[in-house]
Amino acid sequence: MDALEQARAEIDEVDAQLAALFERRMAAVLQVAEYKRAHGLPIFDAAREAAVLEKAAARIHAPALRPYYKDHVQNMMDVAKQYEALILGQNRAAYQGVEGAFAHIALRALFPHAEAVSCPTWDEVFAAVERGDAAHGVVPFENSHAGDVSAVLDLCYNHPDLWVVDVYDLPISQNLLVLPGTQLAEIRSVYSHQQAIAQSETFLKQFHLPATAMANTAMAAKFVADSGDKTKAAIASAETAALYGLEVLVPRINTDGDNTTRFIVISREKPTAGNRFSLLFTVDNKPGKLAEVIQVIGASGFNMASIKSRPMPHVPFEYYFYVELVGDPTADETAALLRELDRTCRTVRLLGVYTK
């Protein structure tokens, strides 16, 4: 046996030992899940995870190996959380649309082992999470080309019991999908989500193609596939084309080559750890009140990564505001900022905590 074979044999032997230890560890995870269910405890415990990682690093004598072992332990904890979610019936994530929609693609990246729950509207995604039918919801929040998804921000405002717990940036490549054998000259109408249509506006104008908005890109692709009509085309992902038996006639028709959609993850569980946090607030309709809030944030030392305004529901010509701040949401400075904003604003609410 040469040196390579001997080393591989050693790895195989260790892997066999790890398999037995993995089963033993997951049996303990099962006990943890049952305890959490009995006592109403959340799956994620940030303080516990941090302590486990520090203890794990201390066990490794070779400094060069410590970061790799911490990654290994973090992966084991992530697997454990997925298993706990399955045991506790929380292994469901909701999205708007059908299989192949960009939200579905984002969901699969975020929750590869979750049961994906399809909803007809964004409102239904929020409702499913609020009812407990899904532990998480994945919805688009903004696009680097087409801008904000205002309706989703309004839903965040209207659902004060839900939190934003994660964000995910999905690079978007819009493609013109057709029935097999279709030529560009045959197309008379194009179907897609309004955002995808806006992202592909230059291409559509160039070829004088009228577009009709649908609930999402995957539904548009399914509609074209089911129609059997070569005069119809859809704008969607290449993954969606494969899913519904369509061909990519023209790839990457979106105007912005760096097109990215940011998705947010909503949950009933309040997040605790991250390097960014977002707030929703309102101010009295008086001169200088918004400027005063911005000055308070600036004086606190937090960088304001984003600020948006939206009309308040049922209150004509008044607005609520969204801000995203860079910083530790658990720091004393954050608590001080929230106290000062509570004094300055008419209303203020912590919306989300996440890592970006």
Where are the regions a protein language model picked out?
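Domain-level signature for soluble enzymes in the chorismate/prephenate branch of the shikimate pathway
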Residues: 1-356
